[in-house]
Amino acid sequence: MEPSTNKPDCKKIFDSIASKYDRTNTILSLGMHHFWNRSLIQILGSGYSLLDLCAGTGKVAKRYIAAHPQASVTLVDFSSAMLDIAKQHLPQGSCSFIHSDINQLPLENHSYPLAAMAYGLRNLSDPHKALQEISRVLMPSGKLGILELTPPKKTHPTYSAHKLYLRAVVPWIGKSVSKDPDAYSYLSKSIQQLPKDHDLEDLFSKSGFYIAKKKKLFLGAATIWLLEKQ
């Protein structure tokens, strides 16, 4: 994944759909994103502190605190509108919020044992730089859990149906529920344009990580990678 020079203004997109984001996601994923988020938390394991990147409205953070009540979570997102929603339903004592781009995290070196990024990889303007920055703030042997929506391979039986769903159904639901068809048209395209597995594996390696675990979910519609800092 090379730095993108023609990626739309993702911050503007997510600010515009923030108020309807959770409801629309539930409809689009048929509620499966709740299971996917839970799987990410299970794969990450326990830790006293979690860095939640592309944190959005805080659903991953909320689930992590429920599973690990003694832990603290730092939520980072470039959309202030998304973080404002997260602040409304997360315990302030356990959570802190940072409005920032991942490419330049205002955090000390080696300061977190665990990090999570759900549905954010395909929206990064410079994935290599972002992953290097995450590696910088992770402790030695720190872990990063990435959850992303992924297109099935062309040889997979669900490929045609999945492609039709992304091209036709996702923008239509986005228009009906969020009233912002352009935003969900972009989100649909970003899933279809996600690099192939071997390209992602190469990206992770060049950014200072190795894949400790990989899990496909719901016929390959989503994938979790557990990366460990080299």
From Swiss-Prot:
InterPro entries: SAM-dependent_MTases_sf, UbiE/COQ5_MeTrFase, UbiE/COQ5_MeTrFase_CS
Keywords: Menaquinone biosynthesis, Methyltransferase, S-adenosyl-L-methionine, Transferase
Pathway(s) this gene product operates in, as recorded in its UniProt entry: Quinol/quinone metabolism; menaquinone biosynthesis; menaquinol from 1,4-dihydroxy-2-naphthoate: step 2/2
Residues binding S-adenosyl-L-methionine: 57, 77, 101-102
UniProt catalytic activity: a 2-demethylmenaquinol + S-adenosyl-L-methionine = a menaquinol + S-adenosyl-L-homocysteine + H(+)
Pfam family, one: Ubie_methyltran
EC number: 2.1.1.163
GO molecular function: demethylmenaquinone methyltransferase activity
Any one of the GO BP annotations: menaquinone biosynthetic process
Disulphide-bridged cysteine pairs: none
Family indicated by similarity: Belongs to the class I-like SAM-binding methyltransferase superfamily. MenG/UbiE family.
Function: Methyltransferase required for the conversion of demethylmenaquinol (DMKH2) to menaquinol (MKH2).
This protein's name: Demethylmenaquinone methyltransferase
Organism in which the protein naturally occurs: Chlamydia pneumoniae
